[in-house]
């Protein structure tokens, strides 16, 4: 037996729309669609031997690179990324860097701090090519899943290196970015 249900909206008994279907068949789940992007708005210099948090982030929007955020957005303040919507998030970080020093490596940490506790995240190193009086460029990627269950949960990005290098960024550059994508409800 085949049945066809024709609807434009699906709502719960209180009237909150859980899903809509447009004329092209695209399904929108307003309670589940959430993605926020940020870009590094200035070149960030990582000094030799010192662990440093990155703080130069600007939220993307339709003016900045045509990326409108969807749903409940993340916010940023002083190197801390937070959200008001609990859930499991896929966090994707891409760093573009350059160095004219013999940096050899960079430690890039995506740190998650649950509800005011201690940061969780390991040392993740990338090799940076040794140069001889020339500039070397490198791209590093990190993807992590974090379970946000409290309003005080936060993500930070920390770096250190053996010799100074620059993480690229600027108001007209789309080089270094971080995205937060909601993938499911929180696990408690």
What are the residue ranges of the model-derived segments?
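Extracellular beta-strand-rich recognition modules
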Residues: 87-97, 138-143, 152-161
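Residue-level signal for glycine
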Residues: 15, 116-117
């Amino acid at each position: 037996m085949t049945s066809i249900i024709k609807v434009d909206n699906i709502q719960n008994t209180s009237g909150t729309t859980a899903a809509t279907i447009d004329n092209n068949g695209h399904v929108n789940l307003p309670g589940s669609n959430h993605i926020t992007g940020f870009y590094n708005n200035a070149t960030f210099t990582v000094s030799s031997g010192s662990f440093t948090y990155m703080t130069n982030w600007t939220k993307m929007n339709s003016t900045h690179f045509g990326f409108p955020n969807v749903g409940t957005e993340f916010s940023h303040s002083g190197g801390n990324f937070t959200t008001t919507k609990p859930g499991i998030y896929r966090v994707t970080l891409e760093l573009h860097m350059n160095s004219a020093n013999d940096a050899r490596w960079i430690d890039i940490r995506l740190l998650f701090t649950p509800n005011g506790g201690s940061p969780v995240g390991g040392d993740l190193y990338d090799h940076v090519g040794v140069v001889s009086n020339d500039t070397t460029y490198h791209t590093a990627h990190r993807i992590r899943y974090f379970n946000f269950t409290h309003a005080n949960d936060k993500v930070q990005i920390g770096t250190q290196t053996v010799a100074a290098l620059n993480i690229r960024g600027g108001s007209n550059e789309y080089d270094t970015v971080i995205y937060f994508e909601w993938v499911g409800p929180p696990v408690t």
